[in-house]
């Protein structure tokens, strides 16, 4: 299979599961990182079907193959920050949620983006839930940011939430509570040493 064959599969209006598996096999394994790079380039295509389908294929990757995508972490964030199509944004956020976030590499522009999106009632529920979870993933490592996250999550109490958004909110509230316990234990340990 060649890149032009993959392009033809990705150019379909709706890819079948069989085609997704075909492209996945074409790119699977550490010895096919060049093929993953090709697929990633397709995610930047001007053709909306090709770019959407390339991102869609990445969402089916297993944890091993997704490791390769971590080197594209900042690029994925940049793409999400500028994305105007909700369907592509949802896939980009899904891929970012499956990646680790390290406190020393946190991007405040992406935190602000996530906060503004999950509190915006005009956006689709999936995007709001993903942004809430991504904000949590980035902000609970730092006490001051945990406070800000909690304040923003509390803003959601003023609106009627869908079941999916309510579930995401509860999950985030649990993670905030757990983060506070860890932060308190860390502070207690630090004061005992002094």
Language model region names:
Residues 1-194:
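Alpha-helical scaffold domains
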